[in-house]
Design a protein with these regions (language model features):
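N-terminal domain-onset segments
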Residues: 1-33, 105-107
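Helix-rich interaction surfaces within compact, conserved domain-sized segments
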Residues: 59-107
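Generic structural hydrophobic/aromatic packing signal, biased to beta-strands
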Residues: 27-29, 49, 63, 68
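Short beta-strand micro-motifs enriched in acidic
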Residues: 40-42
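Catalytic Cys-His active-site segments of thiol-dependent hydrolases/isopeptidases
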Residues: 46-54
Length: 107
């Protein structure tokens, strides 16, 4: 499965025109059982969003699309997947606030 389709790419570009506090995640990725990424921006290969590696809570930051595409999780070597059913219902900053309270991303 392609992680970023043309439609998603266009939505990510539109998000860049909005003030930071109004940007909603456009796409959700997951993998490895506990890893979750909510992505709101893309510039080249670099994505920005809320990232949770299942260790000690989520944080806002940057991640490389090519790195996500290359990840393989044991024991079966499955890669990162896109949640086809994800629809944001709040801003990225609201998801981040909620993740701080819960200790994980709830999306």
């Amino acid at each position: 499965m392609k992680l970023i389709t043309r439609e998603i790419e266009l939505k990510l570009k539109k998000n860049m025109a909005l003030p930071e506090g109004e940007r909603e995640p456009v796409v959700k990725f997951f993998g490895g059982g506990a890893c979750t990424w909510l992505i709101s921006e893309k510039e080249g290969d670099i994505l920005f969003g809320l990232c949770d590696l299942g260790l000690d809570g989520a944080e806002l930051g940057y991640v490389s699309l090519s790195e996500l595409e290359s990840l393989k999780f044991p024991p079966f070597g499955l890669g990162v997947e896109r949640d086809s059913w994800f629809v944001a219902d709040k801003t990225l900053s609201a998801y981040a606030d909620e993740a701080r309270e819960l200790g994980r991303i709830a999306a």
